[in-house]
Amino acid sequence: REHLGVFCRFFLFINLFKLPFSQSAGIITGLITQNVDRLHQRAGAQNVIDLHGRLDQVRCLSCGHTESRSHIQNWLEQHNTLPSLTSVTLRPDGDADLPAALIDDFQTPHCETCGGVLMPDVVFFGGTVPAERVQTCYRMIDEAEGLVVIGSSLSVYSGFRFCRYAIQQDKPLIILNVGQTRADELCLHKFDDDPFSTLSQYVAQLDSQTPERQHV
């Protein structure tokens, strides 16, 4: 997450384009994603809830005001002497050994509204998803005819809770994932297969026929 400039330029994984296609066909009415990269939106998906927040924003811990991450990056570069990546050795975790003077003199921005402390607008491990966002997800499930989980082990409760909620609302739960998931015993159908190949076959079938459509 320290390398936002590089991270934002990654090519979209082609599999992300399959979901917007299903949306345009009337199969999928909304997406709940645990990703923080906004790649679903860049692929053309609509009605997406970023469950764990957005890495392209920062948020004030005091007043909740948000700013773009690129704006903060520009501020950091204008107010600090940043070393070239070629002059330091990055560790596998993205950290590096820097001169003490550089660290001591480093300036950090504050909220432009109230002067508060800023943080990336994401839910880190141990953090809590905002209650309002969770309720929005519940409403999305209420309006759907079922829930499909794609490419997640559901080991984190923030996503698993929606599987439990769907079952409580008598909604069918379908899982597409390689390997075991936390909700295997709850789902109506489990496809232990690669999401890329499975979705590719599914989209090909949509091209050739008009299936009975359920909103998920």
Residue spans of the language-model regions?
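Conserved catalytic alpha/beta core of Sir2/sirtuin-type deacylases, generalized to analogous enzyme cores
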Residues: R1-V216
